[in-house]
């Protein structure tokens, strides 16, 4: 099978091409986008998902908005751009990469406010492409730092999908797995199914399996059993937002995995691009948690799995307390506790 990439850019036709992740692993289909409104829908409906991939997608979305923005003067152009930026930012509130990418695009426009609006539009096009390329470099660097914490023969547990399908390439949590394979290591990955959207089984297992990596899918409630059997040496997950104190928002179920890892004395590593670290958010209590459609819990593949009308609580994310985390691994280096102090130092480098 050809390499699965979540995001592609067609430079000749000025189109964003996204892998439809809602139908994996049964079908592999790509959808083309060229409007901010359609990009909004792609993020909201989880055709594209994963904090880094969402950020890159939003940057292209704001470029599409810029293409049709007023050209009479910068004031009207930027007013329109700000409105569309807020619109795109509302698509999924938990992933900080979304607002990060949009702010970069806004800042780039402001930096060039004295130029002709048509020229600014071209500049924003190149900036979106730069954000895309930078994400690839960040993911590879995270993997290079993470692999130093592992060794040949390691057993790894991961939750949700912080893989190549959640980023522009390599992934964050999966990046060291690809690099370990390149080194010829013999290792095993256990991928939590990740209810209710099943990203662990439909996405992580798919991409690792296609890459020839030894991966075993387990249901979420099997994690404790696998840990108790000594099969797990490290837990590696991604993140959607990290607060200043190290509290980490990630896919629902991650907090439970961290509690189990702490009980069994297994290191818990967060693979984190620095854009996912939100120093302005003091603790996990300040992170907004998206609540999703109840039918994600009560039905699957067109079949009801619970009584119709039953009450449902369906948060998309939970927050792992910083005290359960062994290290936060970024493209700039490995951050150990105390996180509040050391995360600040990271941004001073």
Curated annotation (Swiss-Prot):
Superkingdom field: Bacteria
Enzyme superclass (EC): isomerase
Binding annotation for substrate: 49-51, 92, 199, 250-251
GO terms (BP aspect): L-methionine salvage from methylthioadenosine; pentose catabolic process
Annotated site location: Transition state stabilizer: 160
Pathway annotation: Carbohydrate degradation
UniProt GO molecular function: S-methyl-5-thioribose-1-phosphate isomerase activity
Keywords: Carbohydrate metabolism, Isomerase
Catalysis: reaction(s): 5-deoxy-alpha-D-ribose 1-phosphate = 5-deoxy-D-ribulose 1-phosphate
Enzyme Commission identifier(s): 5.3.1.-
Catalytic site positions: 240
Record bears the keyword Isomerase: yes
Pfam families membership: IF-2B
Record has Transit peptide as a keyword: no
Task of the protein: Catalyzes the isomerization of 5-deoxy-alpha-D-ribose 1-phosphate to 5-deoxy-D-ribulose 1-phosphate, as part of a 5-deoxyribose salvage pathway that recycles this toxic radical SAM enzyme by-product to mainstream metabolites.
NCBIfam families on file: eIF-2B_rel (TIGR00524), PRK05720.1 (NF004326), salvage_mtnA (TIGR00512)
The family this protein is said to belong to: Belongs to the EIF-2B alpha/beta/delta subunits family. DrdI subfamily.
Name of the featured protein: 5-deoxyribose 1-phosphate isomerase
Organism name: Clostridium botulinum (strain Loch Maree / Type A3)
């Amino acid at each position: 099978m050809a390499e699965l990439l979540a995001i592609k850019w067609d430079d000749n036709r000025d189109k964003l091409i996204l892998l439809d992740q809602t139908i994996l692993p049964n079908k592999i289909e790509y959808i083309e986008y060229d409007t901010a409104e359609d990009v909004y829908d792609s993020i909201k409906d989880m055709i594209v998902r994963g904090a880094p991939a969402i950020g890159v997608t939003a940057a292209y979305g704001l470029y599409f908005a810029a293409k049709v923005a007023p050209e009479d003067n910068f004031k009207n152009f930027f007013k329109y751009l700000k409105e569309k930026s807020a619109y795109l930012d509302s698509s999924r509130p938990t992933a900080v990469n979304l607002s990060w990418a949009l702010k970069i695009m806004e800042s780039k426009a402001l930096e060039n406010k004295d130029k002709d609006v048509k020229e600014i539009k071209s500049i924003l096009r190149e900036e979106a492409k730069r954000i895309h390329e930078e994400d690839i470099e960040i993911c590879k660097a995270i993997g290079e730092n993470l692999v130093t914490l592992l060794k040949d023969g390691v057993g790894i547990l991961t939750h949700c999908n912080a893989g190549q399908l959640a980023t522009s390439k390599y992934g964050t949590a999966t990046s060291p797995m690809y690099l370990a394979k390149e080194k010829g290591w013999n290792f095993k990955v256990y991928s939590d199914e990740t209810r209710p959207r099943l990203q662990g089984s439909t996405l992580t297992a798919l991409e690792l399996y296609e890459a020839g990596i030894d991966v075993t899918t387990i249901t979420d409630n099997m994690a404790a059993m696998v840990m108790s059997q000594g099969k797990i040496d490290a837990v590696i997950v991604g993140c959607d937002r990290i607060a200043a104190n190290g509290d980490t928002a990630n896919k629902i179920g991650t907090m439970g995995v961290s509690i189990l890892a702490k009980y069994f004395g297994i290191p818990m590593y967060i693979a984190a691009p620095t854009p996912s670290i939100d120093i302005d958010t003091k603790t996990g209590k300040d992170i907004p948690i998206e609540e999703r459609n109840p039918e994600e819990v009560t039905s699957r593949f067109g079949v009801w799995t619970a009584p119709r009308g039953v009450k449902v609580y369906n948060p998309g994310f939970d927050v792992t307390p910083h005290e359960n985390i062994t290290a936060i691994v970024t493209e700039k280096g490995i951050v150990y506790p105390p996180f509040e102090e050391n995360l600040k130092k990271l941004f001073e480098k």
